[in-house]
């Protein structure tokens, strides 16, 4: 039984698709749905009526679905591209490759297509890329992530139907894969000290490792 699930809710729970069983799921009483919590470097695709949840600073989350095939998902990446010699190796990350936008975007889109989706039907929403630390003026990871994801989708001729990118605030995102509805909450930086620590770790990692539709506020 997933954390927080009642026996009644557990009886309605459908299994996660193969390849996505390790992502943390729990019962959200407010929305009366199974929720899926994505951390940096994670991706989740589903055919179920689930709510995908993540918190973003400079990271980007792409929310993508095919409304005809009834499949959708979300990724959460930290940096634009993995070049030779660049690597994120912190043990807390479930898949270091998916911390990079070039891997994360391909993985999400290809996983949706494998589940019956088609590229010409994809609905795409983008969030994140904020500047949440003062010293990011010198190394604005969020802006680099924005430039990457917009260029990636433009090169593949995949239109974005809604986005909320940039700014100087973190975001909490709720994405309802079955309907494509997205809810976004702007957060104060002080409200999530773990996020601030995470952002500082991004900068430290870069400094010490060698090179290599509509949005509803709630």
Curated annotation (Swiss-Prot):
Top-level enzyme category: hydrolase
Xref: InterPro entries: CheD-like_sf, Chemorcpt_Glu_NH3ase_CheD, Cytotoxic_necrot_fac-like_cat
An annotated Gene Ontology molecular function: protein-glutamine glutaminase activity
CDD domains xref list: CheD
Enzyme Commission no: 3.5.1.44
Disulfide bonds: none
UniProt superkingdom: Bacteria
An individual GO BP term: chemotaxis
Known catalytic reactions: L-glutaminyl-[protein] + H2O = L-glutamyl-[protein] + NH4(+)
UniProt key word Lipid metabolism: no
A Pfam family reported for this protein in Swiss-Prot or TrEMBL: CheD
UniProt keyword terms in alphabetical order: Chemotaxis, Hydrolase
Function, in words: Probably deamidates glutamine residues to glutamate on methyl-accepting chemotaxis receptors (MCPs), playing an important role in chemotaxis.
NCBIfam families per record: PRK13487.1
Family statement drawn from the similarity comment of this UniProt entry: Belongs to the CheD family.
Protein name: Probable chemoreceptor glutamine deamidase CheD
Organism expressing this protein natively: Saccharophagus degradans (strain 2-40 / ATCC 43961 / DSM 17024)
């Amino acid at each position: 039984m997933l954390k927080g699930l009642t026996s009644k809710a557990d009886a309605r729970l459908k299994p996660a698709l193969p390849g996505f069983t390790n992502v943390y799921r729990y019962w959200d009483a407010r929305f009366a749905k199974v929720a899926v919590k994505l951390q940096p470097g994670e991706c989740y695709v589903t055919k179920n009526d689930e709510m995908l949840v993540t918190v973003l600073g400079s990271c980007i989350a792409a929310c993508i679905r095919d409304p005809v095939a009834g499949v959708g998902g979300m990724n959460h990446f930290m940096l634009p591209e993995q070049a030779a010699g660049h690597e994120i190796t912190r043990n807390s990350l479930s898949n270091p490759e998916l911390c990079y936008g070039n891997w994360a975007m391909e993985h999400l889109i290809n996983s949706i297509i494998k589940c019956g989706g088609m590229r010409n039907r994809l609905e795409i929403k983008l969030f994140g890329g904020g500047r949440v630390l003062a010293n990011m003026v010198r190394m604005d990871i969020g802006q680099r992530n924005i430039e990457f994801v917009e260029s990636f989708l433009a090169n593949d001729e995949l239109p974005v139907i809604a986005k909320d990118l940039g700014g100087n605030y973190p975001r909490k995102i709720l994405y309802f894969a079955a309907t494509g509805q997205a809810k976004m909450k702007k957060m104060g930086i002080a409200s999530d000290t773990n996020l601030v620590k995470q952002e500082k770790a991004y900068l430290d990692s870069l400094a010490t490792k060698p090179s290599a539709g509509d949005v509803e506020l709630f």
